[in-house]
Amino acid sequence: MTIRKSNPYLSLVNSYLMDSPQPSSMNYWWNVGSLLGLCLVMQMASGMFLAMHYSSSMELAFNSVEHMMRDVNAGWLMRYIHANGASFFFMCLYLHMGKALYYGSYKSPRVLVWSMGVMMFMLTMATAFMGYCLVYGQMSHWGATVITNLLSAMPFMGGDLVPLSIILSLYLLYISLKTFMKMIFNQSYMCPAKGWVKKVLDNTFCIKKYMHMYLSSRTSPXLYINTMSNMQHMKIMSTKSHTKDRDTSFLEKDIKNMDRNLLALMVGFMDGDGYIRMNKKSKDNMNYIYMSLIMNLNKNDLKLLQYFHQQLNMGKVYNMTPKKGNKLARWEMNKLDLFNKMEPLLEYHNMKFLTETRQKQYLLLKYIKHNKLVYYEDIINNNNYINEFIENNTLMDNFIKLDYFNNWLVGFTMAEGSFLIKKNKDICFQLKQKYNLELFNNMTLFFNTTRKLNINKNKYMQFNVSSKNDIQNMINFFSFSNNQPLLGNKLISYNKWLFTIKNSMRYKELKTPYMSWHQKEQ
């Protein structure tokens, strides 16, 4: 190993100057910034030596410059380096600005870096003008006159200000000569500070951007960074860019302020009507993991989905028309929503999906997130570990002891429950879903009913109650408890169900809630 890599001090320099990993999209235009730094160092060094022999006096200024050229050892070289260095400095400056304009560096989110550069450009021009006047010769005088005549560009009063400014120009130059000298020195030593501020902002932005790209590569197939060789060859495999980054994470206050009861209702609703889909998405000859949570409901439930979307600020809600069937309302959350919003929210409030299928889907999502699996083949390679993780974390019993079970059950009823009214005006309540025997046994215990579960040949579990005692328990649960109320079309069905009970002689002894005329109309 070479000394520049083995030596602890040289290796640091090597990592920044020689083997520094850079994006492959960079080109030679990025050298202009370092050339500006070189020009700045040259100007500061030559200017410091020139200032040692300069006299900031109106009578001696020009003579002191001639003294540098004739009497000072290598003074002519210092002056020409300083003069030509200024020209090269501005050439590099305009090339640097042109590169930034061409590549859109002034656009969001680099507005702050661009603004700092513009401020430095204005200060550099002011410094150059003051330095031009320090020689106090003919060119200095006419240069100051030209700048003074810029006042004529001012509307109305500009023409009157020019004669006054010309009369006072010599006096102003005399007064300001020493001031110019002080300001140039201040600007010269402030310029590196401003440059470092800009550099810090620029590097902070770049680090943030690279971190964003790296994290996105772990969660989204839209961006891919080849990290197999310690990011030596960084590749951005994306042709689509968005001017505004999506909000991909909850703030801590948003998680804490979330209504826990409403969240439990929404989890129950997703448990019933939602499903977490996982498949592979091929791009650039790579199979990425793609996950989403989807809920398809009747088009009449569009407002309900929009309400839930407004509360959680996750995914998108839209109407869709399948090839076969009626129009549907869909709520779809992508992988970023699930990883950065849904999972932290449920973990903070210590909530889980309770149906067996949804539990397995959610635990698979957690495993993929916490183990940073990106490629679909990773799931196959980790299949044994995934099965063990799901088996150890699946909740199989004691559902009714969960503090959020009541509100979860309201949401699950909105998805899978039915308030049935038969032709003979008999009523019953029904819950139906597949592969959840233990969950439905817990519901039987929760409602304290003696009815047995019906299990058909397709393994559909059906919880069905129709006795007066059981119906009263249902009314007590949905109307006389402190649970979240039913929402959407299920609330309309429940009100019709209650209205039938109120007007039936068979159920007249049952206690029912007061119904407004609006509820009766429903």
From Swiss-Prot:
- Region named Maturase: 164-522
Q: Name one GO molecular function term.
A: RNA binding
Q: Which intervals of the chain are annotated as region Cytochrome b? A: 1-163
Location in the cell: Mitochondrion inner membrane
KW Transmembrane (keyword) present:
yes
* Membrane topology label: Multi-pass membrane protein
Q: List the Mitochondrial intermembrane topological domains.
A: 53-84, 132-154
User: What top-level branch of life does the organism fall under?
Assistant: Eukaryota
Q: Which UniProt keywords apply?
A: Membrane, Mitochondrion, Mitochondrion inner membrane, mRNA processing, mRNA splicing, RNA-binding, Transmembrane, Transmembrane helix
Q: What is its main location?
A: mitochondrion
PROSITE patterns, per database record? CYTB_NTER
Q: Name one GO cellular component term.
A: mitochondrial inner membrane
TM ranges: 32-52, 85-105, 111-131, 155-175
Pfam families linked: Cytochrome_B, LAGLIDADG_1
Topological domains annotated Mitochondrial matrix: 1-31, 106-110, 176-522
What GO biological process, any one, is recorded here? mRNA processing
Q: Which family does it belong to?
A: In the N-terminal section; belongs to the cytochrome b family.
Q: What else is known?
A: Encoded from partially processed COB mRNA that terminates with the in-frame coding sequence of the third intron.
Function, in words: Mitochondrial mRNA maturase required for splicing of intron 3 of the cytochrome b (COB) gene, containing its own coding sequence.
Q: What is this protein called in UniProt?
A: Cytochrome b mRNA maturase bI3
Which organism does this record belong to? Debaryomyces hansenii (strain ATCC 36239 / CBS 767 / BCRC 21394 / JCM 1990 / NBRC 0083 / IGC 2968)
Q: Which gene encodes it?
A: bI3
